[in-house]
Amino acid sequence: MFQQIGAVQAKSGTDEPAHPCEKFPPERKCEAVFWKPLPRHEAREILLAARKYELAMKQPGKRTGPLGHVALEVLDYLTNLVDFGNGRLDPSISTIMEKIGRAESCMSALYPNRQRGRRPAGAADKQRLPLEPAGARPRALLGKYVRKAAPLPDDAAQARQERHDTIKAHMDSLSPADRLRETVEDRTRAEQLAGYVERAAQNRPSGPRKAARRRQQSRCSFTTPNRPRRTLPSSHPQKFGGTKGRKAFE
């Protein structure tokens, strides 16, 4: 036992530097991945969409809508505070309370904004200004105030259609197994599925084997062939009451 302990102590005395075990790459720890540039006109559209959404969703007899006037004040302050170049926006609660002149109502006003806006997970102390407070409804309420994207040029649309047709023709020319290898992103899973399809195609009867199986199935069927109609021989008319009985039978 003491020899094993000594061997372990001798190995632990190396001069190699210790390397930390990083579970995630450094890009995931950087906040630059979270922030995105926000143009100034989009910030104005966000605030205008929130105001129109507040008026459109306000119930009769209520003082405020689903957001509230304090939430609009907070959103107005955030749109003026955001860095349009990189989209960074991380004010503290005390700063927001001081700037808009609100106390506890500031905390309650942030909740409707979070509930009606997309908020990334793992960002408890950061704010984002997406133009999706309640799906596509605020964007529809903006109407003409939202900048619409320019239509695609004719050559770009034609190039996209040609590329789509080329890809479709290529996929149609492939076998089912090769099509799985092209479409499934996981290579291991793609090979497994392609192997299943190829083995199923090999075990499927075709050609002479298929014809033999069909003949065997036809022999095992219980359908009787159509037999010709039986006629009474004319040499024994007395068995059926003479000629009259034979005519009645026929």
From Swiss-Prot:
Keywords attached to this entry: DNA replication, Plasmid
Biased composition (Basic and acidic residues): 13-23, 178-190
Biological process (GO), any one: DNA replication
Span list, region Disordered: 1-23, 168-250
Domain of life: Bacteria
Record's compositionally biased regions (Polar residues): 218-237
Function: Required for replication. It likely regulates pTAR copy number.
Identification of the protein by name: Replicating protein
Organism this protein belongs to: Rhizobium radiobacter
